[in-house]
Regions:
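Short, compositionally biased segments
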Residues: 51, 403-407
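Extended, largely alpha-helical regulatory/partner-binding modules appended to the mid-to-C-terminal parts
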Residues: 24, 76-90, 105-114, 121, ...
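P-loop/Walker A NTP-binding region and its immediately flanking N-terminal helices
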Residues: 1-174
Length: 409
């Protein structure tokens, strides 16, 4: 039997399983309970956050055969629920908008809509990547979408909602799917690892959650890759190696060198990372994120909820942050942000990263405002009320018996 990837094996089958989209689950569940289900829905959001999954769950909720009508909690065991989950229900069509872009495709779909469902309660059309439809295809859809048969429901999903015509948007209930927080992704990853009987340290879990960038599907794809490498045990350093992410200790050493002004150590760390085969563009992004974490740890009394870090890494960040000035961290962050823009167009990312780290490590110190005010007051006292140092200014006729004037810096 072929292997079923984690993203498919652990795909949510009910609204209760859906992670990070409670606003969608609650709204749809209440609409079903109150018998206020619209005829057309538009799900929008970045990849891997649950749009198509939610469309299938909604289809099961509307067509579940174990209840007398639509239910917010489908049974998952009746023929309709099983066939919808497998994508073989004859009354639930799931098509890819990228491969059905023309008017003829839409017309073929429309021809089947007036007929009653073969078995289910509703005939449901799920169109993924719906923004790929042509303008003429959308125009052909308009009338049907505005006044569909009572037994027909449309569910559209897209990652680029700005490409969907406003005339279509106005005919649909729109749901915006949020990016999933690293904390929620980490919770789900821990649960799946437990069910799969795989041991992983906290650094590995946090790294997977962080690299997923808000996408649960990406997180499970990354996890599959890491399990293939590490087997039944995952360690943070090994996960970092698989993903091409800089080792946490090396990244912390680089950040410390920049903060403490050791340009030579910063260059040595960059050289070690380059020799290790790490993507220095990725290293630069991780370094920028590290200084964000340092700033948060410096200004927030209890920063743990805002930092997706393992305990050991969190302790290192808090220790380094305690030795820095918030304004200094902001200055370094600004410099690194500009460096990322430069790396995007640079032919040699390593050189750009090296020079940026040297410049930031050799930054002039920030003087406290009290020291600046004290220096200004001292200068004013020396110059005196007449601005000439207590009568020592130039005499009429341009004479200056005191020799060369002293310049004030």
């Amino acid at each position: 039997m072929s292997y079923l990837v984690l993203a498919r094996k652990w795909r949510p089958q009910s609204f209760d399983d859906l992670v990070g989209q409670e606003h969608v689950s609650r709204t749809l569940g209440n609409a079903i309970a109150q018998d206020r289900v619209a005829h057309a829905f538009l799900f929008t959001g970045v990849r891997g956050v649950g749009k198509t999954t939610s469309a299938r769950i909604l289809a099961k909720a509307l067509n579940c055969l174990s209840s007398d009508g639509p239910t917010a909690s489908p049974c998952l065991v009746c023929a309709a629920c099983k066939e919808i989950a497998a994508g073989v229900d004859v009354d639930v069509q799931e098509i890819d908008g990228a491969s059905h872009t023309g008017v003829d495709d839409v017309r073929r779909i429309q021809e089947s809509l007036p007929y009653r469902p073969a078995r289910d309660r509703h005939k449901i059309l799920i169109v993924d990547e719906v923004h790929m439809l042509s303008g003429n295809a959308w125009n052909a859809f308009l009338k049907t979408l505005e006044e569909p048969p009572a037994h027909v429901k449309f569910i559209f999903a897209t990652t680029e909602v700005h490409k969907v015509p406003i005339t279509i948007l106005s005919r649909c209930q729109r749901f915006d799917f949020k990016m999933i927080s690293a904390q929620r992704i980490a919770e789900r990853v821990r649960y799946i690892l437990g069910e799969e009987k795989i041991v992983a340290d906290e650094a590995a879990v946090q790294l997977v959650a962080r690299e997923a960038a808000g996408s649960m599907r990406d997180a499970l794809s990354i996890l599959d890759q890491c399990i293939a490498f590490g087997g039944a045990s995952l360690v943070g350093d090994e996960v970092a190696r698989v993903l091409g992410v800089a080792d946490r200790a090396a990244l912390h050493a680089l950040a410390s060198a920049v903060v403490e002004g050791h340009a030579d150590q910063a260059l040595s760390q960059i050289d070690a990372l380059a020799r290790g085969g790490f993507d220095l563009g990725h290293v630069a992004r991780d370094l920028l994120r590290r200084f964000r974490d340092l700033a948060v740890a410096r200004v927030v009394p209890e920063p743990e909820p805002l930092l997706d870090l393992a305990d050991a890494e969190l302790a290192d960040v808090k220790t380094l942050a305690a030795r820095t000035n918030p304004d200094d961290l902001a200055r370094i962050f600004t410099g690194l942000s500009k460096m990322l823009d430069d790396i995007a167009t640079a032919g040699t990312p390593r050189h750009t990263l090296e020079i940026a780290c040297v410049r930031l490590a050799r930054r002039p110190p920030l003087l406290p405002i009290d020291d600046l005010l004290a220096r200004l007051e001292s200068l004013e006292r020396r110059l005196g009320p007449g601005g000439g140092g207590g009568g020592g200014g130039a005499r009429p006729g341009g004479e200056n018996p005191g020799g060369d004037r002293k310049s004030v810096v």
